[in-house]
Amino acid sequence: MATDGASCEPDLSRAPEDAAGAAAEAAKKEFDVDTLSKSELRMLLSVMEGELEARDLVIEALRARRKEVFIQERYGRFNLNDPFLALQRDYEAGAGDKEKKPVCTNPLSILEAVMAHCKKMQERMSAQLAAAESRQKKLEMEKLQLQALEQEHKKLAARLEEERGKNKQVVLMLVKECKQLSGKVIEEAQKLEDVMAKLEEEKKKTNELEEELSAEKRRSTEMEAQMEKQLSEFDTEREQLRAKLNREEAHTTDLKEEIDKMRKMIEQLKKGSDSKPSLSLPRKTKDRRLVSISVGTEGTVTRSVACQTDLVTESADHMKKLPLIMPVKSSTGSPLVSANAKGSVCTSATMARPGIDRQASYGDLIGASVPAFPPPSANKIEENGPSTGSTSDPTSSTPPLPSNAAPPTAQTPGIAPQNSQAPPMHSLHSPCANTSLHPGLNPRIQAARFRFQGNANDPDQNGNTTQSPPSRDVSPTSRDNLVAKQLARNTVTQALSRFTSPQAGAPSRPGAPPTGDVGTHPPVGRTSLKTHGVARVDRGNPPPIPPKKPGLSQTPSPPHPQLKVIIDSSRASNTGAKVDNKTVASTPSSLPQGNRVINEENLPKSSSPQLPPKPSIDLTVAPAGCAVSALATSQVGAWPAATPGLNQPACSDSSLVIPTTIAFCSSINPVSASSCRPGASDSLLVTASGWSPSLTPLLMSGGPAPLAGRPTLLQQAAAQGNVTLLSMLLNEEGLDINYSCEDGHSALYSAAKNGHTDCVRLLLSAEAQVNAADKNGFTPLCAAAAQGHFECVELLISYDANINHAADGGQTPLYLACKNGNKECIKLLLEAGTNRSVKTTDGWTPVHAAVDTGNVDSLKLLMYHRIPAHGNSFNEEESESSVFDLDGGEESPEGICKPVVPADLINHANREGWTAAHIAASKGFKNCLEILCRHGGLEPERRDKCNRTVHDVATDDCKHLLENLNALKIPLRISVGEIEPSNYGSDDLECENTICALNIRKQTSWDDFSKAVSQALTNHFQAISSDGWWSLEDVTCNNTTDSNIGLSARSIRSITLGNVPWSVGQSFAQSPWDFMRKNKAEHITVLLSGPQEGCLSSVTYASMIPLQMMQNYLRLVEQYHNVIFHGPEGSLQDYIVHQLALCLKHRQMAAGFSCEIVRAEVDAGFSKEQLLDLFISSACLIPVKQSPSKKKIIIILENLEKSSLSELLRDFLAPLENRSTESPCTFQKGNGLSECYYFHENCFLMGTIAKACLQGSDLLVQQHFRWVQLRWDGEPMQGLLQRFLRRKVVNKFKGQAPSPCDPVCKIVDWALSVWRQLNSCLARLGTPEALLGPKYFLSCPVVPGHAQVTVKWMSKLWNGVIAPRVQEAILSRASVKRQPGFGQTTAKRHPSQGQQAVVKAALSILLNKAVLHGCPLPRAELDQHTADFKGGSFPLSIVSSYNTCNKKKGESGAWRKVNTSPRRKSGRFSLPTWNKPDLSTEGMKNKTISQLNCNRNASLSKQKSLENDLSLTLNLDQRLSLGSDDEADLVKELQSMCSSKSESDISKIADSRDDLRMFDSSGNNPVLSATINNPRMPVSQKEVSPLSSHQTTECSNSKSKTELGVSRVKSFLPVPRSKVTQCSQNTKRSSSSSNTRQIEINNNSKEENWNLHKNGHLEKPNK
């Protein structure tokens, strides 16, 4: 290596690198680099790397010495002292490098030459090393590949040998198995034949068993019906006997009690006493059954104890009376709240439990079980007395009842309920709980009875209570005491009457009862607050007469006030609030709130709510030392826990001293509706206004509070709404009207909180402080807004109350109104301009409060209610416009106005970080959350302090709402492409149908979208092909991929998203949500594969014919080439044939053949020559000499029923069956020339016949064609209409299937049943030519909410299509055996009067049985449309009869020989109500006559055949007989249809509101006549529409209701007269049900006359 460098520079051979260069040269001569091994190359590389490192060191050292060498070289030999040397130096430096040579050798040049040489050698060495390494690697790889190939070659060779051996064995085994299988196939074929033979035998046996089973079921059904009828008769008889027994026992008991009373009276009269006036008159026990003594005491919390003692012996007539509520005085000296109610004995009812009857008699002693009461503090509540089966208060001293006495059961209200609801035990006819005494008694007797009824406990003058004996005690001493007490009470009554009576010194007000013998009457029935020192003044006068209106039940007021309970505005006004385990009933819904029923004697007895009478001061004189106790109760539920302070007492306990000289009357303004609360008190304070409301719980704290000075009195008057007292106090001088109690409640606050608008107005006009706050910072406006008193709110706002005042907790009036859902108050505050964004100390806003209660109206007002432009001058028009849609239903508010609240308020978070949306979502208030979501500024992703979003805390419903917040609803439609013109029967088929709407969310992926589309299609196909009304949700659990009609996701040809094509499984770069929005796709269209693709999926969906059947039809056409489709007219034959031809054409074209469709319509003038020309011109018939072409021809012959098949096709049958040149046929052309032709195999012939069955000579053609029969009672026609109409309904509802009870579903089901039952009846009549296919019913209109449109369409279809076809079919059948000389057409053109009668009868029967029956329209609406149907009036009046006695038995069914329609299935599609068990029919003798047999005895069926005894009279003005046997058969069939089990129950169709009068005739033959009084029906005066009849005629009164909610259609069918007896029995028996029928049987009548008399009314014959 060094040699190369040395040769270039021989002068450097003595350099220090010569040694290394010589070594390298020697090494190169010794070896070549290319031959080195890998290890040697590595070693050489390391040596060279070391050498390079050494050279680098040398270079660095030389660089270090470079400066020194340079200086030495340049200046070493010069001396600076010599200027000439310096000049020489400068000369050398200034000259060029090439001109001057250094004076001495330059070591730097040597170094640079060495460095350049080393670099070159290094580059060459590295290149050689890289090449060597690459070659080495390539070599090693090739060696490895070679080894691998060799191994694989060896393996393959070995495997090949193994496979050769195995193949030889397999071939040998296959040969053996082929031989064995060929033998087995022969054996299996033989076995199959045997099994098929056995199967046929089993089928025959099974059919026989099925027939026997059906007969057995029929017999069992009849027997079961008979048993049920007998059981019902036995039940009725037992109930009658039991009722009779009860009456007798009751009568016996009454007589015994009368005897006992008479004996007692005789004994009392014998003893002779001065106390006779205390004895009440003898009364029947029936006037007083239950005597209840209701006592209330007042403790720490006033409670009412009601104890009942029931003194009724066993009663047998199930008659109960309401308890007679008797006032009882207290047994202690403490104050009592006496339930001083008037006695109540209500009218009897029969629904009390029998267990109440068994009670012991106590000899009419009332006071025997009056409990002695403990001290007031021990009293507990017994609401409405002890419950059934329990005893009274365990602390009472009630003696135990005897063993034969039941505990008290009648629940008498201790506090009479204000909501006029009777106790549930009594089930009274009168809804009032406590009516007055028995209404049948004289008022004076009532007064006397009430006056002289003694109290159980009467306090003496000192307040001490003595236990007095009962009022009817036989002791003369007790009677004397009682008389003395009565006299004393009357004296006190007269003395105090001028203070207590409202009409003292004044003329009596209208409506007041007449005065009695005591002078003026004190109030009666008022629950009084008494002290032990005040005499009772409420005895001795008669109770008031009960009002006529149930809502104004004059019951005693509760002994403590009604509590203001904050309840939801949606709650009913008559619900009670539960207070201390005691139900306090609220005001009755019929009375305005605040108009209490007080002092029943002074109220006008009117049926409308009355305002309170003019008030008078009602003062009682209290002795010295007796304080007037105030009633104290606790207020429960009056304020939420979040707002302390509003439920505190209003004043402290204080004494009250009022002069006893105040007695005046003053008039006041009518009290507002919300200003009064029911209550009762006789205290001095509250009676000043003329009624007795007790003190509100606001003013009470704890126990009894004595009333104190004027400021407290002012507060109490304001709290109660006592306007008279309040105005009186306000007129006094020096009274502080702004005085507040210890809680800070002022009089204005109390009045505003309790909603006393008049008091508020008085106080405000007296300049009370409008913004005075209590200790919690609540102002009167806060209290009124919280309680919902909007009139007080409006009044306070008008007096400049601070609408934005915040309490200590930051609650503003708006916040409190929202918290309690008071919509009117919110509206008033918003209109006044209140601030919506004030926050509480907890960070809650009014929006939080409204959402927290779930009140949608409050939230809408907050978000959308705008402040009127003119400030407080807010008129009604602005009000209406600003409350835009609080009741607007589904309309979105953003379409009307935008929210007025900012996004900051909507998204404001409280102390916990929760926004209003958090609260709504967590509580499940979906409506509130939806309103919040409508605000564009809502941030649903905002997180609370626990890092939770709205979605995280939401309920499932709210999560669904949030997920669908921005979802796109894209309708999914199915398209079948273009449908051919309407002449193929496709005019009613729809091209596109909307099946559902897909919800596409932001997070929806393309896979989810594909699954959703596939699932929606599958669900839709299953829903429309199901048997019932399915919704899309109902079928999601069904995992089957194919529906009943054979369609699935595989039937899709293409899908377009808007206008962009897409396929299932395909994905785009954008998500489905972004893709739909960007492309503005308004719908997704699914196109089904159709005939153009050689498929029939679109045909299946358009026609609802199952895909399997369409494919089978196509296979028949391809296999047999000659196919004719036949069925009733309207069976879509033309459409099916054309679609099959299109599909076949495209299939042939796809196979490479040219194809053509030739269509010909056959009419009556279509001749055989025209058909020949058609065959020849279309190249179906080819001359024998001519070779066939490859072109395919499809010929369609439509309407073949219009010509004779045998005449038209007779000459073509043989060549069509054998298509070859070997069987030619000679045809003569029109020019007279004859030529041989044959049909080639590429010709397909299809025909259509609109006829249910072939007859006569046409049957000769049958064996030469493949026939496809489209039967109306078999698939595909059987379910086609149902599937089509269901799909139509789904499309009308935009993919949402309605519920089965929806009116649209009912009207569609009715249209479907009309088609099925119409065909069933026509098949039964033997008129197959009148059968209808479903095509006519495909146009059934589906208009939600307008069912009458469908009925009108049905009437047009009946008049235009059905009735003419039926008329023609009936006439043609009735004239089959007419004189041979005249043709059938003659009979049709000129029908006889008998034939006209039969036609009219048939039309009427069909209309009522098949069309009008089951129509879901109400009867009133249906009657309006009945006149539109032709033939519904059945105008026949017929008198003659015919008899078939001379007919042979077998002739009755002769007309059926031409009827090939299946009769077995005629009742298959009858509605469920048609298959009711026949209660009186023994059975039908044969299919021709279904004889009505009223005798349930089986021996009757063994008599002479009823066929010869049946007669039907169809009479016209003159006597005429039916002209032919077929007419007779038809008449019998019509009669049989009326009584058929398989058809609808015609008797059930008759509307019970018609006046049905049925008379018995004298003699053995009952005759039925009917008078139908219904002005809505089109019946002329001279005609009468005959009644419908089934096996049992339904006789009910005018109040009977339609069964099962289906309106019945009036029937116009004749009624057999053997059903008359039941009517008279049922009309005599009012208590029997309509299901219990007793039929009187006349075994002597063998004939049933169907009478349709000319006159509408028959005289009732004399019996």
Swiss-Prot record:
<feature type="region of interest" description="Disordered">
    <location>
        <begin position="1448"/>
        <end position="1483"/>
    </location>
</feature>
<feature type="repeat" description="ANK 6">
    <location>
        <begin position="912"/>
        <end position="942"/>
    </location>
</feature>
<feature type="region of interest" description="Disordered">
    <location>
        <begin position="498"/>
        <end position="614"/>
    </location>
</feature>
<dbReference type="InterPro" id="IPR019131">
    <property type="entry name" value="Cortactin-binding_p2_N"/>
</dbReference>
<dbReference type="Pfam" id="PF25408">
    <property type="entry name" value="AAA_lid_NAV1"/>
</dbReference>
<feature type="compositionally biased region" description="Low complexity">
    <location>
        <begin position="1624"/>
        <end position="1638"/>
    </location>
</feature>
<keyword id="KW-0966">Cell projection</keyword>
<keyword id="KW-0597">Phosphoprotein</keyword>
<dbReference type="GO" id="GO:0090443">
    <property type="term" value="C:FAR/SIN/STRIPAK complex"/>
</dbReference>
<feature type="repeat" description="ANK 2">
    <location>
        <begin position="743"/>
        <end position="772"/>
    </location>
</feature>
<keyword id="KW-0040">ANK repeat</keyword>
<feature type="repeat" description="ANK 5">
    <location>
        <begin position="842"/>
        <end position="871"/>
    </location>
</feature>
<feature type="compositionally biased region" description="Polar residues">
    <location>
        <begin position="1582"/>
        <end position="1599"/>
    </location>
</feature>
<feature type="region of interest" description="Disordered">
    <location>
        <begin position="454"/>
        <end position="478"/>
    </location>
</feature>
<dbReference type="Pfam" id="PF12796">
    <property type="entry name" value="Ank_2"/>
</dbReference>
<feature type="modified residue" description="Asymmetric dimethylarginine">
    <location>
        <position position="498"/>
    </location>
</feature>
<protein>
    <recommendedName>
        <fullName>Cortactin-binding protein 2</fullName>
    </recommendedName>
</protein>
<feature type="repeat" description="ANK 1">
    <location>
        <begin position="709"/>
        <end position="739"/>
    </location>
</feature>
<feature type="repeat" description="ANK 4">
    <location>
        <begin position="809"/>
        <end position="838"/>
    </location>
</feature>
<dbReference type="GO" id="GO:0005938">
    <property type="term" value="C:cell cortex"/>
</dbReference>
<keyword id="KW-0488">Methylation</keyword>
<dbReference type="InterPro" id="IPR002110">
    <property type="entry name" value="Ankyrin_rpt"/>
</dbReference>
<dbReference type="Pfam" id="PF09727">
    <property type="entry name" value="CortBP2"/>
</dbReference>
<dbReference type="Pfam" id="PF00023">
    <property type="entry name" value="Ank"/>
</dbReference>
<dbReference type="GO" id="GO:0043197">
    <property type="term" value="C:dendritic spine"/>
</dbReference>
<feature type="region of interest" description="Disordered">
    <location>
        <begin position="1560"/>
        <end position="1663"/>
    </location>
</feature>
<feature type="compositionally biased region" description="Polar residues">
    <location>
        <begin position="1561"/>
        <end position="1574"/>
    </location>
</feature>
<feature type="compositionally biased region" description="Polar residues">
    <location>
        <begin position="583"/>
        <end position="593"/>
    </location>
</feature>
<dbReference type="GO" id="GO:0098978">
    <property type="term" value="C:glutamatergic synapse"/>
</dbReference>
<comment type="function">
    <text>Regulates the dendritic spine distribution of CTTN/cortactin in hippocampal neurons, and thus controls dendritic spinogenesis and dendritic spine maintenance. Associates with the striatin-interacting phosphatase and kinase (STRIPAK) core complex to regulate dendritic spine distribution of the STRIPAK complex in hippocampal neurons.</text>
</comment>
<dbReference type="GO" id="GO:0050807">
    <property type="term" value="P:regulation of synapse organization"/>
</dbReference>
<keyword id="KW-0175">Coiled coil</keyword>
<keyword id="KW-0770">Synapse</keyword>
<feature type="region of interest" description="Disordered">
    <location>
        <begin position="367"/>
        <end position="440"/>
    </location>
</feature>
<feature type="repeat" description="ANK 3">
    <location>
        <begin position="776"/>
        <end position="805"/>
    </location>
</feature>
<keyword id="KW-0963">Cytoplasm</keyword>
<feature type="compositionally biased region" description="Low complexity">
    <location>
        <begin position="386"/>
        <end position="396"/>
    </location>
</feature>
<feature type="region of interest" description="Disordered">
    <location>
        <begin position="203"/>
        <end position="222"/>
    </location>
</feature>
<feature type="region of interest" description="Disordered">
    <location>
        <begin position="1"/>
        <end position="23"/>
    </location>
</feature>
<keyword id="KW-0677">Repeat</keyword>
<comment type="subunit">
    <text>Interacts with CTTN/cortactin SH3 domain. Interacts with STRN, STRN4/zinedin and MOB4/phocein; this interactions mediate the association with the STRIPAK core complex and may regulate dendritic spine distribution of the STRIPAK complex in hippocampal neurons. Activation of glutamate receptors weakens the interaction with STRN and STRN4.</text>
</comment>
<feature type="coiled-coil region">
    <location>
        <begin position="119"/>
        <end position="276"/>
    </location>
</feature>
